[in-house]
């Protein structure tokens, strides 16, 4: 595997912004545009499955991309710096790591047409509570027993992460867990396209092989929208 950091060249910020906005051939507001743009770093025949994960962050007002890939990227544009190094984590049972994860927490369910679908865990929990009270909308719930939005986000998303951790060979230290930036991303027609949440904290390695696989393949869904990349580093 390879780990890459993509940052705009300070001497070419305008060109970098133009390349990011239009290099994918998609609308700059399209959440899928980053994915299409980063594909340019991995030239391959048509039909090749995606073999990279990415995450977009902003520091000092400038975007940066973290990318984990099965192949080394090929820099395509002078306006962006691409720093790449081999990524072969050496993990042991009991090792503690700091982690960051932007994920799309969903559960399986059935949509209004009776077909199988994925549902955002927060929205699913709200729907269940409203149904139990015979209410249609969250704003209709006026009682003192109405849960706080952030409490619901933390409870439902942390439960989702705990289940994912069991599948992927690690255990989250609940005392260090942060659940932030719950966002419902909307598509071009203003409908909700997907949701994301940022997790951070410390974890303990239980199964190195499973965790290494998760570092390369990601956790959860919406990977084409910048979710699923688990970033780890030693606890110092």
Language-model region placement:
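RNA-interacting cores
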Residues: 1-236
């Amino acid at each position: 595997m390879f780990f890459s950091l993509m940052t705009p060249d300070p001497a070419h910020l305008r060109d970098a912004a133009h390349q990011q906005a239009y290099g994918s051939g998609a609308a700059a507001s399209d959440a899928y545009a980053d994915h299409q743009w980063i594909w340019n770093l991995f030239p391959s025949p048509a039909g090749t499955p995606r073999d990279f994960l990415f995450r977009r962050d902003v520091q000092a007002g400038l975007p940066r991309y973290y990318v984990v890939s099965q192949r080394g990227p090929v820099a395509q544009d002078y306006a962006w710096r691409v720093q790449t190094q081999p990524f072969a984590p050496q993990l042991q049972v009991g090792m503690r790591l700091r982690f960051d994860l932007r994920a799309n927490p969903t559960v399986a369910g059935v949509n209004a047409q009776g077909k199988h679908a994925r549902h955002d865990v927060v929205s699913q929990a709200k729907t269940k509570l409203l149904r139990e009270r015979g209410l249609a909308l969250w704003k209709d719930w006026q009682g003192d027993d109405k849960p706080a939005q952030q409490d619901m986000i933390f409870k439902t998303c942390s439960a989702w992460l705990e289940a994912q951790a069991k599948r992927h060979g690690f255990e989250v230290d609940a005392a260090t867990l942060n659940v932030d930036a719950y966002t419902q991303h909307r598509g071009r027609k203003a409908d909700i396209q997907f949701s994301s949440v940022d997790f951070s904290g410390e974890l303990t390695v239980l199964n190195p092989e499973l965790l290494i696989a998760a570092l390369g393949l990601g956790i959860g869904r919406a990977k084409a929208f910048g979710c699923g990349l688990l970033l780890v580093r030693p606890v110092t």
